[in-house]
Regions:
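Glycine-rich phosphate/pyrophosphate-binding loops
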Residues: 79-118, 195, 200-215, 371
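Metabolite-binding pocket within alpha/beta catalytic cores that recognizes anionic/polar moieties
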Residues: 1, 71, 75-82, 367-376
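Alpha-helical support elements that line or immediately flank enzyme active sites
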Residues: 71-94, 181-182, 186, 198, ...
Length: 590
């Protein structure tokens, strides 16, 4: 195994590049090395962990790091499976420093040699975004058609959509390419707005990469099985199969994937209509969850996706089969929650249209859903008129008269209008510097406290993040990175100081996996075994754990979390506590 990490520095303004080696020990992976480079160069970095290409399941995530345009602090985002092709370049990390003078595509290829071909090509972005299905998908098709003939094996493409130009929460999208065709199992580095950073700060709309390099990856299954049998009395494959049950198929709930298991178990903890469900009685939440979610939204998913076994991986060999699909529509819990019930949508056809449009535009889907739901509530309570947003309709959010199919379709059409309004800044809807700044400007001009109904975590003066979709205080905790799972998000009540300790522990455990490029869906073994594996392969177990602790401390030293600034945030926590006391009968006096 290599004892150095190879970093390719690329300046998109000139096409100049250089390779630098960093020994394993001072830095172990794309997170701690990315933090070091971001601090020095304000770069956008992406790369893989030390075990990319190995037999360890979930080891091929592509990790992005840098200072986030929407969170306004150091951030980490990751993309499933995209590291498998990246490993064929024979490097560990790419660091972008500088900006192309026009929207461009970065071409990276390594064919039977020591040198990596690095080229920056200008791109007709409007034409690419208009091709085929449009946006991210059209851009991927354009780039593949232009460069496919130069690769001996299938490459991988990273692409952004119009949201990267118009907002601070544009995502980076990708999809496995099989036999020259782009598949439907698209994967995203969504949280953190790195698509906006890639285009606005570096002038790159797409990156295509691939190669033929074969390095010395860890492939000894006998050794790996020995580690797992000593710890779990099971071989690696058996333990991983057990650990990924939820994401494949959980017989306890007769469904699978994050969509299936989470929607089946939410019940009275469901979040709908921008969190207005917080004010419903428990009986109302249970009844509406049963009628709208279980009997319709979830039933459609189970019949169309689970029963037909329409599932795949993110592009790497994996037992989880977590990509649940129907045709081109990929079904994950949080996108289909924020661009679903949170927006008043409980029908798969309506949610598919809205999710696909958001993906094509290149938005972080979770943030988009939170913003759309907030704007819809502003229309419901007349804080804003349709003309203020350049749209023609208002939401249908009356739960007593709600028609699942018809009103879901109506609300989805409204969501599509709002997406166009955001992209083209209609009616003064300018989210280029985030919703907090836009909301404060309207407050000064009109006196409306629009941000009071925006459920979000705040960071510094402008930083923001739509929280993970679980009704628990941990998702609004003052942690240095929010919107991922770097905190405790379980349903149990935990006193504040203990919650802080649990959050810190989760932060360290998630860093431990991300810094080695391991998918968190495999955390059932990864959190325990990764330090042991680093120790066995590199002899640096204690050094790795220390490096993770130092990295967590360095990230936390920049923590600029702001106390909850919206009334909806306060309602979120207060109603959670009331439900724990009155419904869950939690006896804790705190």
């Amino acid at each position: 195994m290599d004892t150095v990490q190879r970093v390719l520095f690329v300046d998109p303004s000139t096409g100049f590049y250089r390779l630098k080696r960093y020994p394993v020990g001072p830095h172990f992976g794309p997170v701690d090395l990315g933090l070091h480079l971001s601090d020095r160069h304000r770069s956008l970095n992406f790369g893989t962990g030390l075990f990319a290409g190995s037999i360890l399941p979930g080891s091929n995530r592509l990790i992005f790091t840098g200072f986030s345009p929407c969170w306004r602090g150091f951030y980490i985002s990751s993309m499933g499976g995209a590291g498998l092709v990246f490993d064929n370049l024979g490097i560990n990390l790419v660091s972008l420093v500088g900006k192309a003078s026009a929207p461009s595509v970065l071409y990276l290829n390594r064919t039977h040699g020591e040198e990596i071909e690095v080229e920056v090509h200008p791109l007709d972005l409007e034409a690419a975004w208009a091709r085929g299905e449009g946006g991210v998908y059209g851009l991927m098709e354009t780039v593949l058609a232009r460069f496919r003939h130069r690769y001996e094996s299938d490459p991988r493409i990273l692409a952004v959509g119009p949201a990267a130009r118009s907002t601070d929460f544009g995502a980076i999208g990708s999809a496995p390419i099989v036999k020259g065709q782009i598949t439907a199992a698209d994967t995203w580095a969504g949280r953190g707005g790195f698509g906006s950073k890639l285009l606005q700060e570096h002038g790159l709309a797409a990156i295509i990469y691939g190669g033929t390099f074969l390095d010395e990856d860890f492939r000894d299954r006998t050794v790996a099985d020995g580690w797992f049998e000593e710890k779990y009395r099971k071989k690696l494959a058996a333990k991983d199969f057990e650990a990924t049950t939820k994401y494949r198929f959980d017989p306890a709930f007769e469904t699978g994937g994050t969509f299936g298991v989470n929607f089946a178990t939410l019940k009275g903890r469901m979040l709908a209509f921008n969190g207005r469900s917080l004010g419903w009685s428990e009986a109302e939440r249970l009844e509406r969850h049963q009628h709208w979610v279980v009997d319709h939204y979830l039933r459609q998913f189970n019949e169309e996706t689970i029963q037909t076994k329409s599932q795949s991986t993110c592009g790497e060999p994996c037992a989880a089969l977590c990509k649940k699909t129907r045709d081109v529509f990929k079904k994950d819990y949080e996108p289909y929650q924020t661009l679903g019930p949170l927006c008043g949508i409980f029908d798969q056809r309506a949610a598919e249209r809205l999710n696909r449009a958001g993906d094509a535009a290149g938005f972080d889907a979770i943030s988009l859903g939170g913003v759309l739901a907030w704007l819809m509530e502003c229309l419901v309570d007349s804080s804003l008129d349709p003309e203020d947003l350049g749209i023609t309709r208002t939401p249908r959010w009356d739960p007593a008269a709600f028609r699942v199919v018809e009103d879901s379709a109506h609300n989805a059409e409204l969501g599509l209008e709002l997406i166009e309004a955001i992209l083209h800044r209609r009616g003064g809807l300018d989210l280029s510097e985030g919703p907090r700044k836009w909301g404060r400007r309207l407050h000064r001009e009109r006196g409306h406290r629009l941000l009071d109904t925006f459920l979000h975590t705040a960071h510094g003066r402008r930083g923001w993040m739509v929280p993970n979709q679980y009704w628990t205080p941990g998702v609004l905790a003052p942690m240095p990175i929010m919107g991922k799972y770097y905190m405790f998000y379980g349903p149990d009540f935990v006193p504040p100081r203990q919650l802080g300790r649990l959050n810190a522990d989760r932060f360290v455990q998630e860093l431990l996996m991300d810094n080695l490029g391991i998918c968190r869906f495999h955390r059932g073994w990864a959190e325990e075994m990764l330090p042991e594996i680093v120790g066995s392969v590199y002899g640096l177990k204690d050094e790795y754990l220390k490096a993770i602790a130092v990295t967590a401390s360095r990230i936390n030293s920049r923590n600029a979390s702001v106390f909850w600034e919206s009334e909806r945030d306060l309602d979120f926590v207060a109603s959670y506590l009331a439900r724990r006391r009155d419904v869950e009968k939690d006896p804790d006096p705190e």
